[in-house]
Amino acid sequence: MTRLSSSFFFTLREAPAEAVAVSHKLLLRAGFIRPLAGTAGLYAYGPLMQRVLQKVGRIVREEMDATGAQEALFCQLQPAEIWKESGRWTVYTQDGTMFTLKDGQGEQAREYGLGPTHEEAVCDFVRASLNSYKQLPFHLYQVQTKFRNEKRPRFGLMRGREFIMKDGYSFHATPESLDETYRAMYRAYTNMFRRCGLDFRAVEADSGAIGGSGSHEFMALCDIGEDTILYCDAAGYAANVEKAVSLVSDPEAIGPGSYAVKSTPGIRTVEQQAAMLGVPISRIVKNIVYVALYAEADPRPVLVSIRGDRHINETKLKNRLDCLDVRLADEAELAAWVEVKPGFVGPDAPIAGVIRLADRSVDGLTDFSTGCNQDDVQCVWANWGENGLVLPEVADLDTAQAGDHCHLAPEATLQSARGVELGHIFKLGTKYSRPMQVLFADEAGELQPALMGCYGVGVSRLPAAVVEQSHDNDGILWPIAIAPYQVVLVPANVAVEAQRQAAEELYRSLTAAGIDTLLDDRPERAGVKFKDADLIGIPLRVTLGRDLEAGLVEIKVRGGGAAEKVPLAEALAQIKGLIERLNSAQHSR
């Protein structure tokens, strides 16, 4: 019998000052989590949180197992050699993402990393036993603690340095097989998040450091989300802003004129340029110099031309260049390369070894103003193909934004929302299997690298996202499927023997029926117990008080309005019905 009087249970009147997110505040106040030695990004899970995580984990495992995936468990401590094979050791150690250590000192010491992800470990496991196409496809997953050296851990469980994740890896002989598993995982993730009571969207996404081709994120919609989602209901389109595509509006009209070079001293922005020249910002071509950073090659200068009223999407630029990262060139680099200040660089700037790119917004643009590679000078009424201006290679490098027209439904405009990433699915292709030699013999007997998929869920982040969406002024509103307990029994006065005995008998009936039940038998005032029950968010509260003399108990749905008095003899049936109703409402979201 789970008695609160003999449980390690604690609540706080106020959340610590450093807690900003609602989920962080409530999970701290309700005793679900505690920071370890005051360290940002490290949290211990209390008994209540562990129950929530177990239920989330069960849902995740049920949906994964239903697709035919097999659960395994891989090493958290991973030798540097396998990460060097894939080419990611430099990436993850240079930016400090991975926690690293050595097993000794001197030249013989071996380097290791605490796994932020497990592509390399899984590839090493599989390549030792994969021989034939007849063994494919298969899908391995784990629910495992991960480590990531977040530079700015914040919002409690939303962004931590140690967290629980479900990560799965599938292996295939053909693209069609990979596509089939990808679709199955899309459905499984949709089921998972619906069962957990979340309001979410699946959006097209960038693959980031994981790499690969196709990619979708599953985003919980909430105000503290660090990601921006752009969507169009008319087209059923949704994408992370890093990936989103839109139709750029036509440039403003401009009067007739002819090519000329004009003095524009002291300007620093396109707004100043437009005002001084008397032209619309949408008729300006700005030329921005970046530096592309590569793992195995020297940095390269990159010159990007884009319309004055648009902004470069650096994720798209990095993907187009297939480089580790991009950064803006500083004034010293500009001075060395082209001897001109920012704002006056032209699309034809004579930079040695430069990669020239143009965003789609300037393709076809006419009568524009742009830099002339000379300080304090701009050219006006310029056109591609005239006066030595050659349109660079065109690519989608624009940052889509709310209000842009949808590329799939041009009559509709994109809307935006904030989201927290809970899941991410990728088509990796041979990004890891080729360098790590995860090979199989095809039907002709020739060795081929296996095609891979990768599928992650933030198991410990998920409850925090639920709390962000499901709470009120009194505390948490857990969905019935993942609540730490489904029912809390509250004898109003445990000193009254009849109340205590009735509560214990009802507890036994409920647990025999498979209902997770907590008995709050603390010698506290009923009001204190009610406040704690609301704070920790148990969906159903049953009070056994003075009405018990008339054979009645009080049942209240958390956040569901007034309590209802029912005969004690009917309480079990009533509670079963309420749980069924709450489950049905959750599944229909």
Swiss-Prot record:
Keyword entries, A-Z: Aminoacyl-tRNA synthetase, ATP-binding, Cytoplasm, Ligase, Nucleotide-binding, Protein biosynthesis
Swiss-Prot/TrEMBL catalytic activity: tRNA(Pro) + L-proline + ATP = L-prolyl-tRNA(Pro) + AMP + diphosphate
One GO BP: prolyl-tRNA aminoacylation
InterPro entries associated with the record: aa-tRNA-synt_IIb, aa-tRNA-synth_II, aa-tRNA-synth_II/BPL/LPL, Anticodon-bd, Anticodon-bd_dom_sf, Pro-tRNA-ligase_IIa, Pro-tRNA-synth_IIa_bac-type, Pro-tRNA-Synthase_IIa_type1
Major place of residence: cytoplasm
Molecular function terms, GO-annotated: aminoacyl-tRNA deacylase activity; ATP binding; proline-tRNA ligase activity
SUPFAM superfamilies per UniProt: Class II aaRS ABD-related, Class II aaRS and biotin synthetases, YbaK/ProRS associated domain
Family: Belongs to the class-II aminoacyl-tRNA synthetase family. ProS type 1 subfamily.
Function: Catalyzes the attachment of proline to tRNA(Pro) in a two-step reaction: proline is first activated by ATP to form Pro-AMP and then transferred to the acceptor end of tRNA(Pro). As ProRS can inadvertently accommodate and process non-cognate amino acids such as alanine and cysteine, to avoid such errors it has two additional distinct editing activities against alanine. One activity is designated as 'pretransfer' editing and involves the tRNA(Pro)-independent hydrolysis of activated Ala-AMP.
Name of the protein this chain belongs to: Proline--tRNA ligase
Lineage, opening ranks: Bacteria, Bacillati, Cyanobacteriota, Cyanophyceae, Gloeobacterales
Protein encoded by which gene: proS
